[in-house]
Amino acid sequence: MTEAESKTVVPESVLKKRKREEEWALAKKQELEAAKKQNAEKRKLIFNRAKQYSKEYQEKERELIQLKREAKLKGGFYVDPEAKLLFIIRIRGINAIDPKTKKILQLLRLRQIFNGVFLKVNKATINMLRRVEPYVTYGYPNLKSVKELIYKRGFGKLNHQRTALTDNSIVDQGLGKHGIICVEDLIHEIMTVGPHFKEANNFLWPFQLKAPLGGMKKKRNHYVEGGDAGNRENFINELVRRMN
């Protein structure tokens, strides 16, 4: 028997299979390396954005302090610019509620007592709030409230499912196409009522708050009358602390 005949002949089908497996392994390796690189770049981008937002918030706070100081020196007082963002909490149930009011509460996504949602201030939302005012309380949330609500009680809507915001990938999946890829992006979009506020707000599931520590005073009375309903302006932040 010659040397050539003694060598094992590998079938062509086996060679093709081996080649396919090697190509698949190489492609998988390249895919993993690309994903690793992409994740590293995304983490860097998220870090830089968070840093940028923090700087932006601090500058805004310093500017506000300076404006108040200047107004005081001139013998006047500083008037806050008109708010763009509201936080609304439903404080009453369904007893003796008329169909139109019930419908508006549903449109506002306030289906249960102690549900809370963000709203952009405009003529339409103000008109709706006036209609349901005996059943809700609302005001102007500050950065601390927005952050604490989203980080502590935030759930997103993914495939019509209520999904906890456990990491940035949840936000990226839901809002990445709008350039909102992390929780800090989401907070910034809500707080500044940005160009994609509607999408960001619809992504957020209504907040389910707890009954306030110390309870409610008089749900049927307006806030300015010593009750709980209606506009409490900046004092909504104190209520958020008690219910979060």
Swiss-Prot record:
Record-linked Pfam families: Ribosomal_L30, Ribosomal_L30_N
Coiled-coil intervals, chain numbering: none
PROSITE patterns in UniProt: RIBOSOMAL_L30
Keywords: Ribonucleoprotein, Ribosomal protein
Biological processes per GO annotation: maturation of LSU-rRNA from tricistronic rRNA transcript (SSU-rRNA, 5.8S rRNA, LSU-rRNA)
InterPro entries: Ribo_uL30_ferredoxin-like_sf, Ribosomal_uL30, Ribosomal_uL30_CS, Ribosomal_uL30_euk, Ribosomal_uL30_euk_arc, Ribosomal_uL30_ferredoxin-like, Ribosomal_uL30_N_euk
Highest taxon in the source lineage: Eukaryota
Molecular functions (GO terms): mRNA binding; structural constituent of ribosome
Gene3D superfamilies listed in its UniProt record: Ribosomal protein L30, ferredoxin-like fold domain
GO-annotated cellular components: cytosol; cytosolic large ribosomal subunit; cytosolic ribosome
Family: Belongs to the universal ribosomal protein uL30 family.
Protein name: Large ribosomal subunit protein uL30w
Species per Swiss-Prot/TrEMBL record: Arabidopsis thaliana
Name of the gene encoding the protein in the UniProt record: RPL7D
